[in-house]
UniProtKB/Swiss-Prot annotation:
Sugar-modified residues: N311, N336, N938, N1003
Keyword Transmembrane helix belongs to the record: yes
This protein's UniProt keywords: Glycoprotein, Golgi apparatus, Membrane, Protein transport, Receptor, Repeat, Signal, Transmembrane, Transmembrane helix, Transport
Biological process annotations from GO: Golgi to endosome transport; Golgi to vacuole transport; protein targeting to vacuole
Transmembrane segments: 1386-1406, 1438-1458
Segments of this protein annotated with the region Disordered: 1470-1498
Subcellular localization(s) per the UniProt record: Golgi apparatus, trans-Golgi network membrane; Prevacuolar compartment membrane
Pfam families, per the entry: Sortilin-Vps10 (PF15902), Sortilin_C (PF15901)
Cytoplasmic compartment residues: 1407-1437
Protein name: Vacuolar protein sorting/targeting protein 10
Length: 1526
């Protein structure tokens, strides 16, 4: 078999020791040459059309080359010993190869290894991707280099390019990438324009404000991302992947023949969307058939494989079962790659994504597949052993036949059990195939039952050739077949070969009684050579042998015309050629018995074809049709032609598919009979399902459609879980899982897929006693149901199907039993316990990599809990996605003196390292890991933080901020690259009164006070709320009377920040309205402002209190106007649409709200749980609260307990939960009748249904926040349309000039009374030369000025105070520094002359404007306001710790109190709180036992300001008194 580029392995080390050429007599036996190596040869590659071969020794990092097909070997000595890190062959030039090192100097050859030249990349190889080099299909000199630049522990991927084959140093293409590709990445793909084919590049680009893959975008450039001649903007654009709009979440690009595929993902799901183009201009989303007969056709991450496709269609295999014992379905696309039809069900796959599928080389329409015969049993139970059968098709998958040897069926080992390199069965040798298989009903064991079979008629018939499993190869276009027995031992001493298509075989001993364990048998890619390479392992050292085998001496003669035959790919019983894919196909081939060799090295056989007339065999079922009883029957909606039925009525008709189509690639000649038989037929518009047309429009009714479901139960509370779908989800359903319950009893579990229109109890769950419902933290399609025993039931498809596994232990009592990985859906951690007796239990942690099918114990016992902290989102060197952090006892015993330690592992507990001792708790929040350690002597806490989960640094609080006894830390939402840490500063015993919120620097180690006297409750929850969807906006309630007696009631006031805590302000009062006058009017001050009820008064901690992530800037809250917050019973309902700048009262009293259609629908209702009132009506607004209408939903007043909708705010459906005279009910309210069409975005403001809205900053008139102004799409209030689910509200960002707000005080500096950063007395500035060590590519550094740039800012230009000081050269860059700062004669003249000319004017200006601040650096253009004493950087000092520690990934977690907060039933284990950990808090400290019940998590885990929250997953108290009732 040939070594293909796609199957190249990594590099390996080898030291050549000796070689022994052994000649054989002519016409007697082959010639052998052997060479010994110490290490295994890897990445074995032939230069195409040559005898030159090279391999890599991965152990010693060397490359070896042979120019005579392995007879002699030499190390490539142009590369220093031990420096060859990676070997890469050029994909489109047979003379070129590249050896990459770990540094920035690499090596290339353009003459098949005869000479090697150095080239510079300037950047390191990327650690995050294997595809470093990307080649251009037309121009071999055009190459992309995917590398990275690291600053400390923070790494950014960077792409470079060359257009001269690295003859000159590579140039930077773009930063912040996740891989770049040439558009012209295959011979067949073209953009349709020569200049675009040459230059067009596609890059996956990471969002500047978000590390998450769900925010990555595809950007295209035709000038290498440079600026154009007439603009300073970079020339790049984002293509409209989804017809008329771009799509974010791009994760990968693949070029398959003439198609380019882009895969996207989104939050809440691992389902992917595939977008396909034939020219990078017009894109389509790949559409798969409707699910039927248990076939799940969703394309999931790491669950689909692009197979070897044809020039006219794409073939993809999609995994449809559990990963531990996978099966799949193979699909084939239409000619433009858009619509896929099911081709082969129940394909055999393995855990690595390999599929038992292979096309027969050179013969159109013939391929072999392995299917799972007992697929139903395997789908039901993952431990069932597969019964695999082999089949072959000769019509591109329309029909399949058994593989037979004589009259017996045989089954063949295929791609999932690769035992050699290259294709499994076939080669360019026409019609010749070899395989390992067995006779019987299904495929058996390779080693015990496998034999070698040969076919010389393209797989129609097979003959047994040799007993036992063998590695095999083809030579001289099939004139010679070579095989070597496969073995697990070093006991193989001979090879076998055949010169007559496998009818007879000759054995030949290896030289010098050599015995090997074979690893690879290979030859040139064309299979036209008479030379082969055999690689095997031997017992003695050196351990590896590379054996060159030459058969050139067996025949002297070269084949003549009489020795050849015309071989037809398909013949009938009489031997006459038959049509295959619409034509006959024949090849010239050497006759079996001819005693000659073709000796046409490096040439491919050429076929001859002749078209036939079309028959029924040339047609297959069209999209969404499947064959039943010989006919194609509809299994899903019809796809209409472009534009059809867009404005039609359901009964209108059009010409649509008959259900049949000609097989793609079939070349048969059309006939009138076949045309008439399969022509388009009349179809109704009601049958369609998208495509180029559109569903018939439904006129707006301007009415709310409502559907009630009454439950004959005695429930008094609900548990409900919204399964938020992702943007890439193919399903449009809105799924909710719920159950009613009483104080002592759990009700049955109900599921709806249409937002409460219909409910059903899943059969799989009916008989189970389920105590917890736990949605997957990151992938909302997956939900776990924990029973009273060890049985865990789960669904991966939003409740359509169910599976189960056995938990390794009982769940822990005080932590969430399941921990999830943010990128790997099937990676699970089980936090369990083992009990020696009822009162003698200890923690045990287990992990699974296949969704619970198999479990292994993680580390030692007495482990309290573990969680995944690895993530693709945060890129740091050495960071592994397998990283796990655990809290465990230092000793494996119940000893009293047995403190907790924090351990980490990167290899599934094979190795563990203690990171911190005396640990009270740890929390993950965005990229940070925050740990609270305990000082046992004085019983206080110390916080420390890490970015990589390995190196922790103590948190340094601001100079002058002293808390005598630190007992409680609460980690708040930290989604803007800084930790928000609440430190309790006033305690009443162990109960929290109030404290300060401190904000960290970018590595979480040094803090500045953001706001003080913040209210907290007895559980250490804090009145702090980030506003969903906006960067840097948050609300707090502060205690206005901190000096009052402890028995005095707190006087709370509300403050808001619009710049992430740098400045806080009171809320302005609303204007007086029809309801009445307010007691005072003010723009917001301590005596008169609007005050809102906050987080500590919330019953459901996970709920979004004020806002919805997609209704940007819209907030609703309860509160009052005055000097402080009053009782909630006296509060009214207020609303803002400008992110809190202005407010208005919308209802008197406390009304519960829900926001839908991304702010287009707002519903208010009085709920019994809040106001103790019954009702029969609600009010709603369709214009963002400008006007309100009343809707009566019941004839009699009922109790309404809640109103809910999707947390994304994207739905037009709402659900009322309540209780009437007939019992508990749900009432679905459908608002779709108020709109007809999807809102459209248009560059023309008059045509667009949206306008651009930017949040304003109350203290910054330019509206800049973090150096930019954000623009959001908002629907115009007068437009009668609805927001598409896939609308991205954030439309764009515009950078601002740098001002004072973009800089903070540097290390050991603090703000002085003049508002300037001054050195803290007694401290020293940081060593400025450390900058060079952290940034090795920089050539200079500045002396400290006292200022540094805020990491989050994107500002450009303006003042740069961190650089307004003397500059010095970095060590080793002195020459570069001198060149950069060399002064020309003209510049010197002006430098001397101009200061004298300006001295008088400057002196006059200084005299006129002197304000006593001379000698200090002053920033910005705002004047004195910049330095006012009430600015936070004046009031609070800032001290910045040098970045000696950094760390990686922190992920939201659901633990402790959240687990217990939903318990309290059935032994304290009630409905679980799942969700995604957003909007939660992490509390460090408090009671004993590692924090106990008072440790919770609260993290939006947001992406650049998209502050989402958890699902409504906690048990909700209904119909009885609670802390929210007044």
């Amino acid at each position: 078999m040939r070594v293909r580029g796609a199957l190249q392995a990594a590099a390996v080390l080898a030291t050549a020791l000796w070689a022994t050429p052994l000649a054989a007599k002519k016409n007697d036996r082959p010639t052998f040459h052997t060479k010994a190596f110490e290490n295994a040869p890897r990445s074995l590659n032939y230069f195409p059309d040559s005898d030159t071969v090279l391999f890599q020794d991965q152990s010693a990092n060397n490359v070896y080359l042979s120019s005579d097909h392995g007879v002699k070997w030499e190390r490539v000595d142009a590369v220093p010993e031990g420096k060859a890190w990676m070997l890469s062959m050029h994909g489109f030039d047979s003379n070129r190869a590249y050896i990459l090192t770990e540094g920035t100097t690499h090596f290339r050859t353009s003459d098949r290894g005869k000479t090697w030249e150095k080239f510079k990349s300037g950047i390191q190889l990327s650690l995050f991707r294997p595809d470093i080099l990307r080649f251009h299909a037309n121009d071999p000199d055009r190459i992309l280099f995917n590398g990275m630049i690291c600053e400390g522990l923070d790494c950014q991927e960077v792409a470079q390019y060359t257009t001269d084959g690295f003859k000159t140093p590579a140039k930077e293409l773009r930063r912040n990438t996740d891989g770049c590709w040439w558009a012209k990445s295959s011979d067949l793909f073209t953009t349709g324009a020569e200049d675009l084919d040459n230059n067009r590049v596609l890059c996956v680009v990471r969002d500047s404000f978000s590390p998450f893959k769900q925010d990555q975008r595809l950007l295209i450039s035709d000038n290498f991302f440079r600026t154009s001649d007439d603009s300073s903007d970079i020339q790049e654009f984002e293509p409209d992947l989804d017809m008329n709009k771009p799509v974010q979440g791009v994760v990968s690009i693949a070029v398959v023949k003439k198609y380019l595929l882009v895969a996207t993902t989104s939050m809440n799901t691992d389902e992917m969307a595939l977008f396909i183009t034939g020219d990078t201009k017009k894109w389509h989303r790949a559409v798969f058939p409707a699910n039927h007969e248990g076939h799940d056709h969703r394309v999931l991450q790491e669950a689909y494989t692009a197979l070897e496709s044809t020039n006219y269609s794409i073939q993809i295999d999609v995994m449809t079962t559990r990963p531990s014992n996978p099966m799949g379905v193979m699909f084939t696309s239409n000619s433009n790659g858009t619509y896929f039809t099911e081709n082969v069900p129940h394909t055999n796959r393995n855990e690595r994504g390999h599929v038992d599928f292979e096309k027969v080389t050179g013969i159109q329409g013939v391929f072999l597949v392995n299917k799972v015969d007992n697929w139903e049993d395997v789908a039901k139970k993952a431990s069932t052993k597969k019964k695999v059968v082999s089949e072959i098709t000769f019509d591109d998958g329309r029909t399949f036949e058994p593989v037979t040897a004589g009259d017996k069926r045989i089954h063949l080992h295929s791609v999932t059990e690769l035992s050699n390199v290259g294709p499994v069965f076939s080669s360019p040798a026409p019609g010749l195939l070899m395989a390992i298989g067995n006779r019987g009903d299904y495929l058996k064991n390779y080693w015990d039952d496998g034999n070698l079979y040969v076919s010389d008629d393209a797989g129609m018939t097979w003959n047994k050739a040799l007993d036992g499993p063998h590695k095999y190869e083809f030579g001289d276009q099939g004139s010679i077949l070579v095989a070597v027995r496969d073995s697990k031992e070093v006991d193989v001493s001979e090879i076998s070969y055949s010169l007559d298509h496998g009818l007879t075989w000759t054995k030949q001993a290896l030289p010098d009684d050599l015995k090997i364990r074979p690893y690879i048998l290979t030859t040139t890619q064309e299979s036209a050579s008479l030379k082969f390479l055999l690689i095997g392992m031997v017992k003695e050292s050196p351990s590896w042998q590379v054996i060159s085998i030459d058969f050139d001496g067996l025949h002297e003669a070269t084949c003549k015309e009489d020795d050849m035959e015309e071989w037809f790919a398909r013949v009938d019983k009489d031997g006459k050629p038959t049509c295959l894919m619409g034509h006959t196909q024949s090849f010239p081939r050497r006759k079996k018995k001819a005693e000659c060799f073709l000796k046409q090295e490096f040439k491919h056989p050429v076929s001859k074809t002749e078209n036939c007339e079309c028959t029924d065999k040339d047609y297959e079922c069209d999209f969404n049709f499947a064959r039943e009883d010989g006919k194609c029957v509809a299994k899903g909606p019809i796809i209409p032609p472009e534009g059809v039925c867009r404005d039609a009525k359901p009964d209108d008709t059009f010409k649509g598919t008959s259900g049949y189509r000609k097989i793609l690639g079939n070349t048969c000649k059309e006939t009138k009979e076949m045309d008439d038989k399969y022509k388009d037929v009349e179809r109704k518009c009601s049958e369609i399902g998208g495509g180029g047309g559109g569903k018939p429009s439904t006129p707006a009714t301007d009415k709310i459609e409502q559907i009630e479901n009454v439950f004959d139960k005695d429930w008094d509370r609900w548990e409900k879980h919204y399964l938020e779908r992702g943007e890439s989800s193919s399903s449009e359903g809105e799924t909710i899982i719920m159950r009613g319950r009483t104080k002592s009893k759990l009700g049955p579990i109900y599921v709806t897929e249409n937002h409460g229109k219909e409910w059903h109890v899943p059969k799989y769950l009916k008989e189970e006693e389920i105590v917890h419902i736990v949605p997957h933290q990151y992938f909302k399609d997956m939900v776990f149901f924990i029973t009273t025993g060890k049985k865990i039931i789960y669904t991966t498809d939003r409740g359509r199907t169910y599976h189960s596994f056995k938990a390794p232990n009982e769940p822990s009592d005080d932590v969430m039993p399941l921990s999830f990985h943010p990128d790997k859906k099937n990676w699970l951690i089980w936090n369990g316990k083992k009990c020696e007796s009822s009162d003698d239990c200890f923690g045990v942690v287990s992990y699974s990599k296949d969704g619970g099918d198999h479990w292994q114990t993680g580390g030692s016992i007495y482990t309290r809990r573990c969680e995944f902290t690895g993530s693709r989102a945060y890129k740091y060197p050495g960071r592994k996605e397998e990283q796990i952090l655990c809290l465990k006892h230092e000793k494996e015993s119940k000893a009293k003196d047995n403190p907790m330690v924090l351990i980490s592992t990167n290899d599934w507990f094979d190795n563990e390292e203690i990171r911190q001792k005396n640990v009270r708790e740890f929390a993950t929040m965005a990229e940070f890991v925050v740990v609270a350690t305990e000082n046992s002597a004085n019983k206080t806490l110390q916080a420390s933080a890490s970015l990589d989960g390995a190196t922790f640094a103590d948190a340094l609080f601001p100079h002058g901020f002293v808390v005598p006894h630190q007992h409680i830390y609460t980690v708040l939402d930290s989604s803007t690259h800084a930790v928000n840490l609440f430190v309790a500063t006033s305690m009443d015993g162990n109960l929290c009164n109030y404290g300060s919120i401190l904000k960290s620097n970018s590595n979480g180690t040094s803090y500045v006070v953001s706001v003080g006297n913040v209210n907290c409750d007895e559980d250490s929850y804090v009145d702090f709320d980030k506003i969903a969807g906006l960067e840097g906006v948050a609300l707090v309630n502060v205690v206005a009377n901190p000096d009052a007696e402890s028995s005095a009631p707190k006087r709370l006031q509300t403050k808001i920040t619009h710049n992430d805590g740098a400045q806080w302000a009171y809320l302005s009062t609303p204007p007086n309205d029809d309801i009445g006058k307010f007691p005072c009017q003010s723009s917001g001050d301590e005596k008169c402002a609007l005050h809102l009820h906050g987080y500590t008064e919330r019953r459901l901690r996970g709920n979004t209190w004020y806002s919805s992530e997609s209704a940007v800037g819209i907030m609703v809250a309860w509160g009052n106007v005055g000097d402080s917050l009053g009782p909630r019973k006296d509060s009214d309902t207020f609303m803002t649409t400008d992110a809190g700048l202005t407010w208005k009262r919308v209802k008197q009293g406390q009304w519960t709200w829900a926001i839908g259609d991304q702010g287009g629908i707002i519903v208010l209702i009085q709920t019994t749980s809040v106001s103790r009132k019954k009702t029969k009506s609600l009010v709603y607004s369709l214009d963002q609260g400008k006007t309100w209408k009343e809707h009566e939903f019941a004839s009699d007043e009922v109790e309404v307990w809640d109103v809910t909708t999707l947390r994304s705010g994207s739905s037009q459906n709402f659900l009322l939960w309540g209780k009437g005279s007939k019992g508990p009910f749900t009432l679905k309210l459908d608002f779709s009748g108020f709109s007809e069409d999807v809102c459209k975005v248009d560059d023309d403001p008059d045509k667009s249904d949206y306008y651009l809205w930017s949040p304003k900053h109350p203290m910054q008139p330019d509206g800049c926040l973090f150096g930019h102004v954000s623009q959001y799409l908002r629907k115009k209030s007068d437009r009668k349309c609805y927001n598409d689910f896939k609308l991205q509200p954030l439309y764009g960002k515009e950078d601002c000039k740098c001002t004072r707000e973009d800089f903070e005080c540097d290390y050991n500096y603090q703000l002085d009374p003049f508002g300037q950063c001054s050195l803290v007395p007694g401290l020293e500035p940081a060593d400025p030369s450390a900058w060079c060590k952290q940034h090795p590519d920089e050539i200079e550094y500045h002396e400290p000025t006292g200022y540094r740039r805020i990491p989050l800012t994107t500002c450009v230009g303006g003042r740069q105070p961190d650089k307004e000081s003397p500059v010095h050269a970095c060590a080793g860059h002195e020459e570069d520094f001198e060149r950069k700062h060399a002064v020309s004669g003209l510049a010197l003249f002006f430098a001397i002359t101009v200061p004298f000319a300006l001295a008088g004017a400057a002196g006059w200006y200084v005299w006129r404007n002197w304000n006593g601040k001379f000698g200090q650096i002053r920033l910005g253009d705002q004047g004195a306001a910049v330095f006012e004493a009430d600015r936070p950087w004046v009031r609070y000092p800032v001290i910045v710790l040098s970045a000696v520690a950094a760390v990686v990934v922190a992920l939201p977690v659901v633990v402790g109190a959240v687990w217990r907060s939903v318990s309290g039933l059935l032994g304290g284990r009630g409905g679980a709180g799942g969700g995604d950990g957003r909007g939660r808090w992490s509390r460090l400290g408090g009671g004993g036992g590692g924090g106990g019940r008072r440790f919770t998590t609260r993290d939006s885990f947001a992406r650049g300001g998209d502050y989402a929250v958890v699902d409504d997953d906690e048990g909700e108290l209904l119909g009885e008194d609670s802390d929210e009732e007044v």
